[in-house]
Amino acid sequence: MEIVWFKRDLRIIDHAPLFEAVECGAVCPLYIFEPDIWSQPDASRRHYEFLLESLTELDAALSALGQGLIIRVGDAVEVLDTLKAETGFTRLWSHQETGNGWSYARDLAVKEWARANGVSWKERKQHGVMRGTHSRDKWASNWHREMYQPQISPPVQLKPLSLPSRNLPAAADLGLGPDDCPGRQKGGRREAMSLLDGFLTERGQTYRRDMSSPLTGEWTCSRLSPHFSFGTLSIREALQASEARRRAPMEKGWEGSLRAFESRLRWHCHFIQKLEDEPEIEFRNMHAAYDGLREDSFDAARFTAWSEGITGFPFIDACMRSVTATGWLNFRMRAMLMSFASYHLWLHWRETSLHLARLFTDYEPGIHYAQAQMQSGTTGINTMRIYNPVKQSQDQDPDGVFLRKWVPEIAHLPTHLIHTPWAAPDKGQYPDPIINEHRARKIAADRLYSLRKTTTHKRIAGEVVRKHASRAAPPRRHRSSGKETASAQFELDL
């Protein structure tokens, strides 16, 4: 019997482990529900609910082939050990996973168990992230080669099995408390395909122009990111569908928007590659010269104001309240939230990134922690961007539409005052700014720029570049910037 372990790849199409396993014999499609992962500080109920919806559809798709999903609950090694006693399997199939530190440790334990028990664990690449690479040279070319392979068809049928399946624990039994997210995106393959179709036929036309605003980005972005995170849709499927759309007759705007989208699919994998190459960046600074910079100055009151959207800066608060209620925010505004917490409030990126991880339905550890560090200035190799929240508000929401929706306390203010309510004589109950924006920005910039001038910083930065920076541009027909430009940093909107 072949065991296909579904992890964050909840689909039957373009699924190499499933396809290859079926060629070898009867297949047990397995999902191991691991309660311990839900006690980790980056987990939340909105993730759990999206997962359940995706598992329900996966089970239906597999059942239509002849064998539904076998669910087992518990520690992965213990579950596999029990399953081996039941079936005697000698091959385990799965996709490679670049997850959080907990899943990395679990995979190491499974690898050791497989070795000790005569099980061949066959992992296949997903999304174009390269395992075991020691250099970023030719990474873009390799990624394109991988992404332009033909998509893998689902099996024609699966042989029915007599193995028992278990029920999933309830959220409350996992310690997952209430999570008020009325605007959360729904999980499952059908929703992913509907979003992809809507993006490629209607919403994506103004993607390149409108992605930077939280008002327009909500509509024009693909909104596929949680489906990439849980694997209900593959990056290859989205990329090839976008290219096919570009080959068809198009109205003005489509060409540039679809090329921008395709570029961001590559950057999606580029950032996950950073965590694959250096799992420690989830926990420690990418550039060691920043160790100790913020660790001893965490202000709990500032963190609370930031996390609850009551900083006194309307655009910051509107963005935080929006992502809390919907699980999604366009990328520029995510970067602004992180930057404001790290620079203006001088909070360490670890705690603030965990809070955002719990809020983002599309939480992807590889992108998340690399970006958290970029917006906090601790990579040492990227442009230091300290957002002015008032300017961003005026640029991205000039008429105050987004502000009035999410910060109703100031909805009565005229447009010329809504971005700076502290200047209004009747701002009501909305709080005053918790910091002096100009002063806080200057202090943060001075601290980091002085550190960047040191010889030690420059030496370590060279090491970081060699390990993590993008190198060459991709082949000409897929050309986009091979450098980590400021634009690429902030425009991963999917």
Language-model features: locations:
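Active-site-proximal binding-pocket segments
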Residues: 223-412
